[in-house]
């Protein structure tokens, strides 16, 4: 990772996206 804050934000967004997907609603960009 070149930028720590970007790294953390990316990981956080991924978790957030997974959380919403499990909750039954899409959130954020689609990830494979």
From Swiss-Prot:
Superkingdom of origin organism: Eukaryota
Predominant subcellular localization, coarse grouping: secreted
Residue pairs linked by disulfide bridges in the UniProt entry: 1-7
Keywords linked to the UniProt accession: Amidation, Disulfide bond, Hormone, Secreted
GO molecular function, one term: hormone activity
Modification Proline amide, positions: 32
Subcellular location per the Swiss-Prot or TrEMBL entry: Secreted
Physiological role: Calcitonin is a peptide hormone that causes a rapid but short-lived drop in the level of calcium and phosphate in blood by promoting the incorporation of those ions in the bones. Calcitonin function is mediated by the calcitonin receptor/CALCR and the CALCR-RAMP2 (AMYR2) receptor complex.
Protein name (database record): Calcitonin
Source organism per UniProt: Bos taurus (Bovine)
Lineage, top ranks: Eukaryota, Metazoa, Chordata, Craniata, Vertebrata
Gene: CALCA
């Amino acid at each position: 990772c070149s930028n720590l804050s970007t790294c953390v934000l990316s990981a956080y967004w991924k978790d957030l996206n997974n959380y919403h997907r499990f909750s039954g609603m899409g959130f954020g960009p689609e990830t494979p």
